[in-house]
Amino acid sequence: MLQGTCSVLLLWGILGAIQAQQQEVISPDTTERNNNCPEKTDCPIHVYFVLDTSESVTMQSPTDILLFHMKQFVPQFISQLQNEFYLDQVALSWRYGGLHFSDQVEVFSPPGSDRASFIKNLQGISSFRRGTFTDCALANMTEQIRQDRSKGTVHFAVVITDGHVTGSPCGGIKLQAERAREEGIRLFAVAPNQNLKEQGLRDIASTPHELYRNDYATMLPDSTEIDQDTINRIIKVMKHEAYGECYKVSCLEIPGPSGPKGYRGQKGAKGNMGEPGEPGQKGRQGDPGIEGPIGFPGPKGVPGFKGEKGEFGADGRKGAPGLAGKNGTDGQKGKLGRIGPPGCKGDPGNRGPDGYPGEAGSPGERGDQGGKGDPGRPGRRGPPGEIGAKGSKGYQGNSGAPGSPGVKGAKGGPGPRGPKGEPGRRGDPGTKGSPGSDGPKGEKGDPGPEGPRGLAGEVGNKGAKGDRGLPGPRGPQGALGEPGKQGSRGDPGDAGPRGDSGQPGPKGDPGRPGFSYPGPRGAPGEKGEPGPRGPEGGRGDFGLKGEPGRKGEKGEPADPGPPGEPGPRGPRGVPGPEGEPGPPGDPGLTECDVMTYVRETCGCCDCEKRCGALDVVFVIDSSESIGYTNFTLEKNFVINVVNRLGAIAKDPKSETGTRVGVVQYSHEGTFEAIQLDDERIDSLSSFKEAVKNLEWIAGGTWTPSALKFAYDRLIKESRRQKTRVFAVVITDGRHDPRDDDLNLRALCDRDVTVTAIGIGDMFHEKHESENLYSIACDKPQQVRNMTLFSDLVAEKFIDDMEDVLCPDPQIVCPDLPCQTELSVAQCTQRPVDIVFLLDGSERLGEQNFHKARRFVEQVARRLTLARRDDDPLNARVALLQFGGPGEQQVAFPLSHNLTAIHEALETTQYLNSFSHVGAGVVHAINAIVRSPRGGARRHAELSFVFLTDGVTGNDSLHESAHSMRKQNVVPTVLALGSDVDMDVLTTLSLGDRAAVFHEKDYDSLAQPGFFDRFIRWIC
């Protein structure tokens, strides 16, 4: 016992001496290592700001308020970007650059500018207030950074925009953002206000969007304060990403002196079974087999299905009358032919031979045999050891020479807890640690009792032979296991190298003899892989001859045979007696019929509406804030009003008649006009075509200059004597502050009657009434206020404008006994989406349902359908049958496929239910118009055609009318039958009685006159 105690004390003294020697050597060596470490890693960061100063941003009320907030947001942002040592490992330094854009780009600070010059240049920019070409701004930014690129610089870009674009001349946002990311630029997308397009911002931002988009905004919602949280979050991401780019572990890679040779380690445990090897190379192609015998003929095929009946051909043209033939002689009556005997019935055919049996599959390869486990029984679990205190990880010191034994110091207490550090980047994988020292010898455990033998499992069914599988993917690395229990004495290791002769130690106590018993049974090996496919089997024997087949079914009747040849001409017969007088003939054409044909042929007998000598100039806003859909409604308003003014002067230079001109405007230099004296505008149809060809400019808003342009270029240069001049101005009342406000009265005091129409813009910003009063020459009665652009085309407002422009019209009709309708211009191709809403109530009836279904198909065949779903021209058609509140049936969505429309109509069933048209309208908008697949096109005119008598439930009727106005729906109502509810029909037509076609029954749908009138109306 005394000898064991002396051994422990001697070992302790030796270890203490070694530790003291190491501490003496570590101190100067650590100082030398710190002196050899390089300085903190330099990490230059360039931040580029891209500011949107287009009209959709800067014209928000009040003007340039969002640009003012940008000029506050950016300096506050960069004031928090200080040069610093981040995590005491990288030295961050900041430089800046920036540009602002609209439909043009201006670089106000090149990349690499310092803070003072950048802020000075930022405060000097002014907004463009025109269109939005974001892709060109991103392309310009990328080129600027590429030219100024320096090695080791981290680039970030902060793009402040609302996501709206008016054009993509540089390839689109996605393309340019991807090119910027390829250049190593990380893009943050920040919204200047709440009127944003989120998808556009996500197209700009780098991924993941949780870092580079994350609802960043310059201002707090419903406030004018800078969003400090956005600044903090973006800066945090910038620093962390820059740290990951710049930080390199270099000081920790200094090699130390080699340590002493270690003891030979214990023999390792048996390793696990290795991963399956990769499949071997594909074997060479086998030799071609011998040619097989010719097979027996196959059985006779069954007769094909009878073909569908073809469609009726088009009516042929009426042939010219032939010359009168000579009187023929009566021929002799021929003899009747004999009826031939029936043919013999054929014998049934023999049953064909059976097919060859399938080839047998090849046997699979034998799987690998699992390794046999070591036998043995598990010992009893030893007592758990005490948990030692976890020490802090120290630096690996250099191995020193053995020193004299030192005095053991007292055990130090735990140090204070350090501050929580910022989360660092993921560390590089460390080097593999050296083998640990042997643990203390554990006590020998008593042998445990042998466990009972388990029950035998049931014999499973033999599995099917599977194909050879590919090796599975490598499994994830298992979690770090818990520290093991105190182990038993290991096997003796191999003899190590002979060491230096040491001092003779005391004699040790003899150990107890160890137990020898088998270990636990090893785990079963993994299941072997299936073997390869076996060789193909030989050809099977011929099967037995089959029994005779059943008697065939009776065939279909054959087509009649060809007609026989005519017999020879017989002798002339005796003249017959005089015949009786025939039935009375059809009545001749009436004067009305003749005049109808004349009017349909030449159109020279129509009534004309004359407003006297009248000049009308429409000034319409074509700026970015209006939006494409609202601009289209402006053009439709102009066409609808001019339709009410009657015929246009055939000679624009004559002193009488109506002339119409149009000015569409955006920013300076973009004005376009249809002149009053344009010789090409000599009819209503030519004027409509010119208006439809006007394209949305999508720039700034220079209303005062546009009014001056309208007077100087249209009214002043072509004014006629004794002619009333009207001007209709459509705008939201706001304009670019750089434009001269004095020109708002450019049409006043010039004998011009001005009507100013103020409507909210695409962002639902209210118009400014003060500017509207200036445009209308301070006459409040000539100012019209509206909320939605769809109110422009309402029937009531069109009537009001007709009364303003032509208060005392003169209707001149030819003296004809028959009346006719006003001529309508032919249908022209443009994008139209037509949704038919068919009343499926019990009042309709099965027969009328089929007539309505045929009418929808005829309309689809008559219209020029689109070539694809995103075709910018032509029409698409949809059908919804509505019944009770929960009984709406979409027969087919908006489609351009005539075959699909025909098949859907054939399978549509009559509902025979109640009628709630309000629920039908809401369902049509949600399920057809707003459908993510095949919904209404963005720039197409949306038309709802109702087939109903108006006798329906009034639930949500007015709400559905409001929904149609919000969707800019153009309604048409086909009121069929004598018992109709005009109040409901007027509500469905949004107050436009001209859009209600009242016919006596559903048979009228097939009348050519009604059908042509309907087609011209919806076009």
Swiss-Prot record:
Residues 559-569 have a biased composition (Pro residues). InterPro entries: Collagen, Collagen-VI/PIF, VWF_A, vWFA_dom_sf. Changing L837P: In UCMD1B; prevents collagen VI assembly. One of its GO terms (molecular function) is extracellular matrix structural constituent conferring tensile strength. Residues 46-234, 615-805, 833-1014 form the VWFA domain. Residues 306-318, 365-377, 419-429, 524-557 have a biased composition (Basic and acidic residues). The modification Phosphoserine is found at S705. Prolines at the third position of the tripeptide repeating unit (G-X-Y) are hydroxylated in some or all of the chains. Changing P932L: In BTHLM1B; results in reduced intracellular collagen VI assembly and secretion. It holds the Pfam family Collagen. It is found in: Secreted, Extracellular space, Extracellular matrix; Membrane. One of its GO terms (biological process) is phosphatidylinositol 3-kinase/protein kinase B signal transduction. Glycans are attached at N140, N327, N630, N785, N897, N954. Residues 257-588 are annotated as: Disordered. A motif (Cell attachment site) lies at residues 366-368, 426-428, 489-491, 498-500, 539-541. The modification Phosphothreonine is found at T701. Collagen VI acts as a cell-binding protein. It is linked to Bethlem myopathy 1B: A form of Bethlem myopathy, a slowly progressive muscular dystrophy characterized by joint contractures, most frequently affecting the elbows and ankles, and muscle weakness and wasting involving the proximal and extensor muscles more than the distal and flexor ones. The clinical onset more often occurs in childhood or adulthood, but it can be prenatal with decreased fetal movements or neonatal with hypotonia. The hallmark of Bethlem myopathy is long finger flexion contractures. Inheritance can be autosomal dominant or autosomal recessive. Ullrich congenital muscular dystrophy 1B: A form of Ullrich congenital muscular dystrophy, a disease characterized by generalized muscle weakness and striking hypermobility of distal joints in conjunction with variable contractures of more proximal joints and normal intelligence. Additional findings may include kyphoscoliosis, protruded calcanei, and follicular hyperkeratosis (rough skin). More severely affected patients manifest at birth and never achieve independent ambulation, while patients with milder phenotypes might maintain ambulation into adulthood. Belongs to the type VI collagen family. This is Collagen alpha-2(VI) chain. It comes from Homo sapiens. The gene is COL6A2.
